[in-house]
């Protein structure tokens, strides 16, 4: 009898252990993040007309491989800035507005489960991004993009995905610095909340309402950095550290590779990862969640940056989107004129140049302004002598900026230029010094790099001036006259042509430089184009048929006995070739 009781007890104990074991389950979730793809959908650069690295065509091969391993537990997410960059995006933004947008079509085909808005997506304007969002088979998020009419998010703030009983909440946010760069008409009816308080609010709601096992931040904002006025441009790392609840923060926007674990204020580990840009790498995150009786008992997060250039171009993908490839290729292959000489942005750093002065000339003609501001937007862009094609316009003018005319006093014009040249040029103490302001140290045998962003190196046209590089910052500029020889006055108000990025405060040249408050910038705008500058460039070239670009020589660096030889040396350091 005792023997039977012991056997029964043993069987009961074994059954309980088996039941407990059956109640415990380990689930592996794979997250793949693309960010800042910038229209790099095909392994071909439609601007430079050559084969290219990265691309969604390679990402498709990687995603397909991972889905064979993880099935539906493989989650593809896109973190924004997909609608601007290559002509592939431009064509479906503005030329073919009837077909499904190729960015939506491709991500739908690849099985993307969630997307996020980026600042360059906003820059395309409501007509483009509203259409694209509707065509996506997945939600495009934006918790901190607020509809002024309702006070609620304009887009879905978060998405909850359930895989094998594991609930994954994804909270999407964008850098709130949009108004510092973009005209209000592109984001009319909206405003952008700071990321950290927005994250606190929605993490609390998500935890209370959704009972998630994992919380993922999908943030189109970089690691840390710029504070524009009272707005923090890149707050992803701040949110990861200061707002408890996140297991993973997927970053973007700053085009910088990152993969690191940080500890938040609650003492928990958070993976922070950023795949930079152009789909050369993707964020590859592995979540392992163990649940017992419906509760998480163990959770681990590992991440790496997966190199897409180790993967083949997907033939399946290329065949599927062959019609779109052909449409874009036909678009960029259209001849619009002829140019009588080769022009390059490389000359623009060392003085008046045909490349930049062509844009100055166009801005002045379109706007009727007295003065023009313009910077090289591509580091080493070049348009070769001969036929000009639509593709060349993306080299000549990289971004979809509008043209503004603003009212600035003579003193504000000078102060604007003082800041531009202060971040551009070194203060030379001898003829052996660098003319350019480089990152230190400049190592022998290696290329030099600018200390600051070259897209903020604005020169002017419409005025004659010199830049004395022996003087300290704030004292370099001497404006001698208007370009027609009439006097220039510090007190007079002038009409100044410049792009919308600059006119909205981008680069701080108008605010920190000219001393105009952010709030007053909009009041200074007296004219704005309906279309981007590239559109008007194309129109201008088609009308002219043959371009004869030349440097206007309205400004120069002095003293020339120092600056001319220094320019030759610095050109060699920057580009690895002699200045012609």
Give a label for each model feature.
Residues 24-30, 34, 39-49, 53-65, ...:
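Catalytic centers of hydrolytic enzymes
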Residues 1-25:
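Bacterial Sec-dependent N-terminal signal peptides
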Residues 4, 171, 501-503:
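A composition-driven signal for long, intrinsically disordered, charge-rich low-complexity tracts
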Residues 21-310, 350-362, 372-374, 528:
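Acidic, metal/ion-coordinating pockets
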Residues 12-14, 20, 58, 77, ...:
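Generic detector of low-complexity/intrinsically disordered segments
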């Amino acid at each position: 009898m005792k023997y039977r009781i012991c056997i029964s007890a043993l069987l009961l104990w074994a059954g309980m252990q088996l039941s407990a074991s059956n109640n415990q389950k380990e689930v592996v979730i794979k997250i793949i993040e693309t960010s800042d793809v910038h229209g790099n959908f095909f392994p071909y650069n439609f601007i430079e007309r050559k084969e290219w690295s990265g691309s969604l065509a390679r990402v498709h091969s990687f995603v397909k491989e991972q889905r064979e391993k993880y099935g539906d537990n493989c989650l593809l997410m896109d973190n924004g800035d997909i609608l601007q960059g290559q002509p592939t995006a431009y064509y479906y933004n503005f030329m073919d507005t009837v077909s499904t947008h190729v960015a939506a079509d491709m991500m739908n085909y690849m099985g993307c489960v969630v997307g996020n808005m980026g600042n360059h997506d906003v820059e395309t304007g409501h007509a483009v991004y509203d259409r694209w969002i509707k065509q996506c088979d997945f939600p495009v998020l934006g918790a901190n993009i607020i509809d002024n009419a309702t006070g609620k998010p304009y887009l879905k703030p978060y998405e909850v995905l359930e895989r094998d009983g594991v609930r994954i909440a994804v909270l999407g946010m964008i850098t709130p610095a949009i108004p510092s760069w973009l005209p209000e008409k592109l984001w009319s009816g909206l405003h952008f909340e700071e990321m950290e308080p927005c994250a606190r609010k929605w993490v609390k709601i998500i935890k209370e309402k959704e009972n998630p096992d994992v919380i993922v931040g999908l943030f189109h904002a970089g690691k840390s950095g710029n504070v524009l006025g009272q707005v923090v441009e890149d707050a992803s790392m701040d949110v990861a550290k200061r707002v408890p609840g996140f297991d993973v923060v997927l970053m973007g926007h700053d085009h910088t590779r990152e993969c690191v674990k940080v500890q938040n204020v609650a003492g928990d580990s958070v993976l922070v990862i950023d795949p930079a840009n152009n789909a050369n790498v993707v964020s590859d995150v592995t979540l392992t969640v163990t649940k017992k009786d419906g509760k998480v008992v163990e959770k681990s997060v590992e991440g790496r940056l997966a190199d897409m250039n180790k993967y083949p171009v997907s033939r399946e993908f290329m065949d599927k989107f062959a019609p779109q490839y052909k449409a874009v290729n036909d678009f960029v292959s259209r001849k619009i004129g002829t140019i009588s000489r080769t022009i390059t942005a490389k000359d623009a750093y060392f003085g008046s140049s045909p490349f930049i002065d062509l844009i100055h000339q166009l801005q002045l003609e379109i706007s009727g302004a007295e003065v023009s501001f313009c910077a090289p937007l591509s580091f080493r862009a070049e348009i070769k002598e001969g036929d000009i094609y639509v593709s060349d316009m993306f080299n000549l003018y990289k971004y979809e900026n509008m043209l503004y005319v603003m009212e600035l006093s003579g003193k504000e014009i000078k102060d604007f230029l003082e800041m531009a040249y202060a971040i551009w040029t070194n203060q030379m103490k001898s003829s052996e010094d660098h003319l350019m302001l480089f990152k230190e140290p400049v190592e022998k045998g290696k290329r030099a790099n600018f200390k600051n962003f070259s897209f903020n190196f604005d020169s002017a046209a419409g005025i004659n001036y010199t830049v004395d590089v022996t003087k300290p910052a704030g004292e370099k500029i001497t404006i001698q006259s208007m370009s027609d020889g009439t006097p220039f006055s510090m007190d007079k108000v002038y009409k100044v042509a410049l792009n919308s990025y600059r006119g909205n405060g981008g680069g701080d040249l108008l605010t920190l430089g000219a001393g105009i408050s952010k709030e007053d910038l909009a009041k200074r705008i007296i004219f704005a184009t309906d279309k981007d500058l590239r559109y008007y460039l194309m129109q201008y070239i088609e009308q002219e048929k043959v371009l004869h670009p030349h440097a206007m020589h309205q400004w120069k660096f002095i003293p020339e006995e120092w600056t001319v030889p220094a320019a030759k040396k610095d050109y060699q350091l920057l580009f690895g070739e002699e200045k012609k």
